[in-house]
């Protein structure tokens, strides 16, 4: 009897439903880091620089680049044969001469500060007043400017280049199929092609490319301050500027006799409108503004906040923004790209320097 009861208890116990097995807890979802969130936000407004700025009307070729580099450094394109593109836009000095305004023909001073040539091809227009659409058109200006390189005419420039025997073959290779490739337009196209690869990737580009350690926490704090203060309302795009015009003195008037874009359009609305400069390499490209009137970066940051945004920044905010801006300092990927080339020798008919 006892054995039967035990067997009954065993069988009935086995017939009870088993305890349900609880599913395994899903692994915790990793939350993005603060740096990753910052990368996501910043890259949407200020993406990394591309390797070049193409122009469908002027395809970049090795032959154009080689020729353009030579022309960029050739002082024979100036009246006194002392000045070249590189005289004011020095490639071994972040593309500037660090002067308020540049020294041109016969020691004359230009009316505006010479902006850096680096990354300029990404800008929507050229010059402070936007009078040139692209770097090809821009390259035509200084050569004929009486205050700058002072050549008397396009024809005179072409004649100089044609008088240098070594250029004939270089132009033929750069512009194949053209019966007369040495033209003023082609001189500008070659220089423009060379400039379209004058790009300076920096630590910031590594950061928005996904490297959270590329810039320090202090510099990331500066980026946040840059965003919160409103600097990005004008300094936008991969070049942190160069994409729009803005009035100098939006909130607080700025004293200047230069009317900016008004000189080009004669439109009253364009008075005091200037192209917003790029902040790439800004640590190295002072003095600042169209007239080079501001000597140092912290002062420039503070003044822009006051006059453009109506904000009085604390010293800490200025320091934070300055720290971030230094992450935009870069250099060409290939230093050989900016090295001065050996120029073709003058011919028997090449004009002599004219100091007048």
Model-derived features: positions:
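Bacterial N-terminal signal peptides
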Residues: 2-12
